[in-house]
Amino acid sequence: MTSAQTMLNRVITLAMLASMLVVHSACSMTKERDPLTPPGVIVSPYDATQGDVLWAVIPPLNESGTSIADPNEVGDAIVAAVQQIRGVRCLPLNRTIDAMRSLGFLGGIETSSDAHQIAEYLGADGVLVGSITAYDPYDPPTLGLALALYAKPGAMAQTTSASLDTRALTSAFSDFGTTAGHNFAGQPVSVVSEHLDGRNHEVQYAARAYAEGRSERQSAMQWRIYLASMDLYTQFAAHHTVGRLIDEEWLRLARQPASEGAYD
């Protein structure tokens, strides 16, 4: 009798354990999973009827005052940010470095003419020149970036409806859209400068927005991981600064029809 009771108790215990496992499994299946959220994207203002425009990125100059800033690493982050712009393609940084070596600019560029030569050599519609103005990898990090965009006239327009102006074809370099031939203008079409201090709450807010769709919500650090890693912070800073540059491009092209009206 005692043996039978012992066996019965074991059966009851096993049945209870099995029931608990079933309930736990059901709860796990019904538990809401971390929803996927698409990250924010940058959209270019350029006319896409002829395909994406092509940019080249020159490794930024290190003007931060510290030797630990790597221009090539920051340049790669800028290239990655440009690649994420809808309507824009970007050449790999190594392609640009090879072009600089072939043209004798391995020590860096000194004038806008140097940037133009590199862009013409690569067949790019635009070339992005920049500098690292601040670099502090310690928590909270700081990164300053300045970017200047040089563009081939006619290659980065908002619309193709503008009529051809024969006077513009013989004019000297002026502003975008009214210069001669396919040469690059002497001045950048858009310039931005950002100093992103990780202690600044506005910068933290921008980093959190950038992390949306790019980080795990259930992780311990969540969006703050972009403040804890200088590599990730550099990705954020490059994306933020490139986004500001595109904002300037939207404004520039919004003003373009008014400036071209005299030639219609």
Language model segments and positions:
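C-terminal/domain-edge helix-coil "capping" segments
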Residues: C27-G51, Y138, T142, P153-D264
